[in-house]
Amino acid sequence: MVVKIKGKVFVFGDNVNTDEIIPARYLNTSDPQELAKYCMEDARPGFGRRDDIKGSIIVAGENFGCGSSREHAPVAIKAAGISCVIAKSFARIFFRNAINIGLPIVELKEADEFEEGDIAEVDLENGVVRNLTKGKEYRIRPYPEFLMKIMEAGGWLEYCLKEVGE
Amino acid sequence: MGKTLAEKIFSEHVGRDVKAGEIVLARVDIAMAQDGTGPLMINEFRELGFKEVKVPKAFLFIDHASPSPRKELSNSQKMMREFGKEMGVKVFDAGDGISHQILAEKYVKPGDLVAGADSHTCTAGGLGAFGTGMGSTDVAIIFGLGQNWFKVPETIKVVVNGKLQDGVYAKDIILEIARILGSDGATYKALEFHGSCIENMNVEDRLTISNMAVEVGAKAGLMPSDEKTREFLKKMGREEDFRELKADPDAVYETEIEIDATTLEPLVSLPHYVDNVRKVSEVEKEKIKIDQVFIGTCTNGRLQDLEIALKILEKHGKHPDVRLIVGPASRKVYMDALEKGIIKKFVELGAAVIPPGCGPCVGIHMGVLGDGERVLSTQNRNFKGRMGNPNAEIYLASPATAAATAVTGYITDPRRFI
């Protein structure tokens, strides 16, 4: 897991749903690179095909990823090269899917203090998010203990297999 | 201290008493994926090195784009059928219907833990089962291990008392709940339904309400299992699957909301969020023209939904400018509707009756809208682009409101047609 992430911010609103993140009409494939092209398509058409999104950070409002259970949503975001999603809150299924596929996501109540183009830095290990452009720093709630254990075990499956026994 | 329904069901599946907030490993009774999420689930299953399916009941459903409209999807579906054969997993195919409806008809028992790679798996809550939607990786793990980790959710108690007036239905109750809680008001939590209105409601209506629990962010929408549940299971030819299951009277809830059914009016959810709810009687004044009406889906595609809609349309006729699409939720619903002459009447009225399945709700086929067009649908979700075109508008309402709208051509309160 990358513990320190830095990138340019793209700002989205509240309730960004999975139909906007990856519309069903593009779900002809499970290939991450194909899905990446249409990442955020119905929230911001053409977003997934921009040259400048690699390594960037999506910052959004409440309830990011609500709607369908399609894991293609975090997969598309990750494959598009987005390094992290910061949101005021996440929908439950999206949160789980993102953890399972290794897309770093961070809950930050002050997410709306970011503006498009700001440079953000996320320090997962120390639980800090910085807005380098505005010179601001925020403490974030670390992942729940159980999820940290999953990560320490080297992934969710490894943890589960160990717990369940052979 | 007493238990909520969620705590009861998880305690049974963990093997000890568990409380809200705990993270537990629980065994799963029923797991499934559909043709949107299934191919990815199968890839993960194979990548993780599983050799056999260990969950007691595992199913694959080809319902989202079925029969397939494109060769890429046909190839994914082919792969699902091959996996099903190889692993001994039953595949429900074109013409069989929507996963959640089939599960309710044939398999879900009160107290079951049901995990599906589809967000509306919470429909199973209508039978007193803990149904919840998960991603493909999570379901692949359940296929392989028969269990997964869950956080036992806190519960919001939803009390619905009183009798609904004519023309107001279960769909209006869940839209009212969406209006009150908002689209993330129950995130990570379970809804548990109580009150005289719920007690007097049949399972078909309960399924409609539980189906949309996820639209307020909930992990599950749990109904009690009572005599109404027994009636439904008996009708499905499996009364032996019944057992009574209710929360303890002294269970602890996170919050409680109360709804007076007697004063509830027909409601409609406006684009592009489910919680953007208003009274149909108010919206009607704006004369919002509707191009297409869709009656169907896992929310409202059951026999009684078709009957309610037909009763209005039969009496008043369909507006010539409205395209009416009717989709029975399952093969059984389709057969029952055929036997009762309902399908014939819909066809005579000018409707396009589509094969059982998700139909236009998922935006892949069978009713994709044109730019600037508006649809009123009995489905559960009206996100921008949901039905295949981000430049179209989706309105959500009950089958009665849908039928009344198909009569006039604009969003219409059904009460004056009843």
From Swiss-Prot, chain A:
A single BP term in Gene Ontology: L-leucine biosynthetic process
Signal peptide bounds: none
SUPFAM superfamilies (alphabetical): LeuD/IlvD-like
Keywords associated with the record: Amino-acid biosynthesis, Branched-chain amino acid biosynthesis, Leucine biosynthesis, Lyase
Top EC class for this record: lyase
Catalytic activity from the UniProt record: (2R,3S)-3-isopropylmalate = (2S)-2-isopropylmalate
Involved pathway(s): Amino-acid biosynthesis; L-leucine biosynthesis; L-leucine from 3-methyl-2-oxobutanoate: step 2/4
Xref: InterPro entries: Aconitase/3IPM_dehydase_swvl, AconitaseA/IPMdHydase_ssu_swvl, IPMI_Swivel, LeuD, LeuD/DmdB_bac, LeuD_type2/HacB/DmdB
Pfam families found in the cross-reference section: Aconitase_C
This enzyme's EC code(s): 4.2.1.33
Record keyword Iron-sulfur present: no
GO molecular function terms noted in the UniProt entry: 3-isopropylmalate dehydratase activity
Subunit and interaction comment: Heterodimer of LeuC and LeuD.
Protein purpose: Catalyzes the isomerization between 2-isopropylmalate and 3-isopropylmalate, via the formation of 2-isopropylmaleate.
Entry's family note: Belongs to the LeuD family. LeuD type 2 subfamily.
PANTHER family: 3-ISOPROPYLMALATE DEHYDRATASE SMALL SUBUNIT 1, 3-ISOPROPYLMALATE DEHYDRATASE SMALL SUBUNIT 2-RELATED-RELATED
Name recorded for this polypeptide: 3-isopropylmalate dehydratase small subunit 2
Organism of provenance: Thermotoga maritima (strain ATCC 43589 / DSM 3109 / JCM 10099 / NBRC 100826 / MSB8)
Curated annotation (Swiss-Prot), chain B:
Pathway the protein contributes to: Amino-acid biosynthesis; L-leucine biosynthesis; L-leucine from 3-methyl-2-oxobutanoate: step 2/4
The protein's name in its UniProt record: 3-isopropylmalate dehydratase large subunit 1
Highest taxon of source: Bacteria
Binding note for cofactor: Binds 1 [4Fe-4S] cluster per subunit.
EC number: 4.2.1.33
Entries under InterPro entries matching the protein: Acnase/IPM_dHydase_lsu_aba_1/3 (IPR015931), Acoase/IPM_deHydtase_lsu_aba (IPR001030), Aconitase_4Fe-4S_BS (IPR018136), Aconitase_4Fe-4S_dom (IPR036008), HAcnase/IPMdehydase_lsu_prok (IPR011826), Homoacnase/IPMdehydase_lsu (IPR006251), IPM_dehydratase_rel_enz (IPR050067), IPMI_cat (IPR033941)
The organism of origin for this protein: Thermotoga maritima (strain ATCC 43589 / DSM 3109 / JCM 10099 / NBRC 100826 / MSB8)
Catalytic activity: (2R,3S)-3-isopropylmalate = (2S)-2-isopropylmalate
The entry's keywords: 4Fe-4S, Amino-acid biosynthesis, Branched-chain amino acid biosynthesis, Iron, Iron-sulfur, Leucine biosynthesis, Lyase, Metal-binding
One record GO biological process: L-leucine biosynthetic process
Cofactor(s) it depends on: [4Fe-4S] cluster
CDD domains given in the database record: IPMI
GO molecular function annotations of the record: 3-isopropylmalate dehydratase activity; 4 iron, 4 sulfur cluster binding; metal ion binding
Similarity field: Belongs to the aconitase/IPM isomerase family. LeuC type 2 subfamily.
Quaternary structure, from the entry: Heterodimer of LeuC and LeuD.
One Pfam family hit: Aconitase
